[in-house]
Amino acid sequence: MIVPVRCFSCGKVVGDKWESYLNLLQEDELDEGTALSRLGLKRYCCRRMILTHVDLIEKFLRYNPLEKRD
């Protein structure tokens, strides 16, 4: 859904790195580990926050509960 703002374990801010992470993966064609290292995420707890995030917001935006089905 929404990227967590802080790491659950250590409290470091990780929410501002999500867009940069996606850009590094797509435009620079880096692997996940290298991209996380370039973003300055050294601790495995912080790396976990980015690696395991599932971005579901686009699916929820398409859902309209007021729309009638035929």
From Swiss-Prot:
Key word Repeat present: no
Pfam families documented for this protein: RNA_pol_N
Gene Ontology biological-process annotations: nucleolar large rRNA transcription by RNA polymerase I; ribosome biogenesis; RNA-templated transcription; termination of RNA polymerase I transcription; termination of RNA polymerase III transcription; transcription by RNA polymerase I; transcription by RNA polymerase II; transcription by RNA polymerase III
Source species, domain of life: Eukaryota
PROSITE patterns reported in the protein's UniProt record: RNA_POL_N_8KD
One of the record's GO cellular component terms: RNA polymerase III complex
Keyword Flavoprotein: no
Assembly information from the UniProt record: Component of the RNA polymerase I (Pol I), RNA polymerase II (Pol II) and RNA polymerase III (Pol III) complexes. Component of the RNA polymerase I (Pol I) complex consisting of 14 subunits: RPA135, RPA190, RPC40, RPA14, RPB5, RPO26, RPA43, RPB8, RPA12, RPB10, RPC19, RPC10, RPA49 and RPA34. The complex is composed of a horseshoe-shaped core containing ten subunits (RPA135, RPA190, RPB5, RPO26, RPB8, RPB10, RPC10, RPA12, RPC19 and RPC40) where RPA135 and RPA190 form the DNA-binding cleft.
Function recorded in the entry: DNA-dependent RNA polymerases catalyze the transcription of DNA into RNA using the four ribonucleoside triphosphates as substrates. Common component of RNA polymerases I, II and III which synthesize ribosomal RNA precursors, mRNA precursors and many functional non-coding RNAs, and a small RNAs, such as 5S rRNA and tRNAs, respectively. Pol II is the central component of the basal RNA polymerase II transcription machinery. Pols are composed of mobile elements that move relative to each other. In Pol II, RBP10 is part of the core element with the central large cleft.
Protein name as catalogued: DNA-directed RNA polymerases I, II, and III subunit RPABC5
Organism: Saccharomyces cerevisiae (strain ATCC 204508 / S288c)
